[in-house]
Amino acid sequence: MGVTQVIIGVPKEICPGEERVALTPANVGALLKKNGVEIRIERGAGEAAGFTDGDYENAGAKLTDRDDIFSNAQAILQVQTPGSNTTNGQEDLDKLKAGQFLIGMTDPLANAQFAQALAERKVTGLALELIPRITRAQSMDVLSSMAMIAGYKCVLLAANASHRMFPMNMTAAGTMNASRVFVMGAGVAGLQACATAKRLGAIVEAYDVRPAAREQILSVGAKPVELDLDTGEAEGSGGYAKAQGEDFLKRQRELMKEVIKEMDVVITTAAVPGAKSPILVTEEMVKAMKPGSVIVDLAAERGGNCDLTKAGETVVENGVLIIGPTNVPSSVPFHAS
């Protein structure tokens, strides 16, 4: 048996509502194949995601407590580091020691103070959100993988809240028309939302400010909505949409109003890294929608794409339900982990 050179520690997540775990039993086994690696898991770390302490022990990990991990691990893996856990992450930050590596989601663009705090403690932080969207880093691209899960789950939230069934059905009483679903933003989350809504039988349309998104929308069976706007420079690095000026957004909202008033479900997914989410759906636009319609705002944590969104709440305005879910991937913790 080789000499232990690196101890990797996985503490239980303490961020409220976080049910994911940073390392699954299957990946414990993969890491232990490397010489000199020891893995310590806090007892109960994987329970909320469906992984028992026994699963970790069988994979070769050692069960321990939180203090042992922060005292002795050279590398600490967390889903929500103190940078993204602003509720009670300070207690973990205070436990970190010089020379340690902290790997996880740190929200560095919105929380620069955390990066400074790590530097002062001589702790090296790896912000998984900043890993570029390239082939070599694909297995560590947490933004894309979590966005895929969020796009899937937001459609289920919409279907559950809607007064209508998604698919067309022929019944003895007559024909029930399929629901019309409109997805705003055709990134990873938006495309997955399109695909999921299509599988449920809805008529799906989608819009993205990036011209290149048209083919992607078609590839998942949705119909691209095209607006009379100049979008030549709408795409930034890494394939993400660039923030647009207020004049552009105002014109976009005027044109979009005519589209969404016909929809049964609207899903918004537009987010700008490190910045407040752009307002795509105004209160006036909501009032033009049919009673019983549903809006699911996946950008709720960054202020929301809808004027009326309240993070973590469901608001009813003029008979329209506006759902502002937060940390959606955590609601599917097994696969998200």
Indicate where each model-derived feature is located:
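An N-terminal-biased, well-structured beta-alpha scaffold segment characteristic
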Residues: 4-117, 121
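Generic hydrophobic/aromatic pocket-lining and core-packing "Φ" positions
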Residues: 28, 53, 115, 155, ...
